[in-house]
Swiss-Prot record:
Cited InterPro entries: Globin (IPR000971), Globin-like_sf (IPR009050), Globin/Proto (IPR012292), Hemoglobin_b (IPR002337), Hemoglobin_oxygen_transport (IPR050056)
Function: The epsilon chain is a beta-type chain of early mammalian embryonic hemoglobin.
Lineage per the UniProt record: Eukaryota, Metazoa, Chordata, Craniata, Vertebrata
Positions carrying Phosphoserine: 14, 51
Binding site for heme b: 64, 93
Name the UniProt record assigns to this protein: Hemoglobin subunit epsilon
Keyword Iron in record: yes
Entry-linked SUPFAM superfamilies: Globin-like
Gene: HBE1
Homology family: Belongs to the globin family.
Keywords carried by this UniProt record: Heme, Iron, Metal-binding, Oxygen transport, Phosphoprotein, Transport
Tissue expression from the record: Red blood cells.
Organism: Callithrix jacchus (White-tufted-ear marmoset)
Length: 147
């Protein structure tokens, strides 16, 4: 189990409160699909994913990105119990969707990049460290069913 200090929790929740989940979620998933094109195979039903502009403008990518980032809100509310929080999603992604758990780590890293671009100077090394710890812990929780 990952332990978050009070300072880390404050850094995470402070930034989360300013986050536009719809915008950042679509951007994060879109960037994942552009930078790591092999991840597109999990989104065959999303329509046109033929170019970066098609991906970033795709309404299904934006909608699913919002859904994904909304689940990070659950992580923030349950930082001390991520394994239980993501048990059902882990099972879904493992048993039904067969998603490589490495993709969770990649998405987390993309999210950290999105945060850095959106928050600039406010995204200090300390804030980055807290968020990196969270996205890593979420990736581990999502990959739990695979073990």
């Amino acid at each position: 189990m990952v332990h978050f200090t009070a300072e880390e929790k404050a850094a995470i929740t402070s930034l989360w409160g300013k986050m536009n989940v719809e915008e950042a979620g679509g951007e994060a998933l879109g960037r994942l699909l552009v930078v790591y094109p092999w991840t597109q195979r999990f989104f065959d039903n999303f329509g046109n994913l033929s170019s970066p502009s098609a991906i970033l403008g795709n309404p299904k990518v934006k909608a699913h990105g919002k859904k994904v980032l909304t689940s990070f809100g659950d992580a923030i509310k349950n930082m001390d119990n991520l394994k239980t929080t993501f048990a059902k999603l882990s099972e879904l992604h493992c048993d039904k969707l067969h998603v490589d758990p490495e993709n969770f780590r990649l998405l987390g890293n993309v999210l950290v990049i999105i945060l850095a671009t959106h928050f600039g100077k406010e995204f200090t090394p300390e804030v980055q460290a807290a968020w990196q710890k969270l996205v890593s812990a979420v990736a581990i929780a999502l990959g739990h069913k695979y073990h």
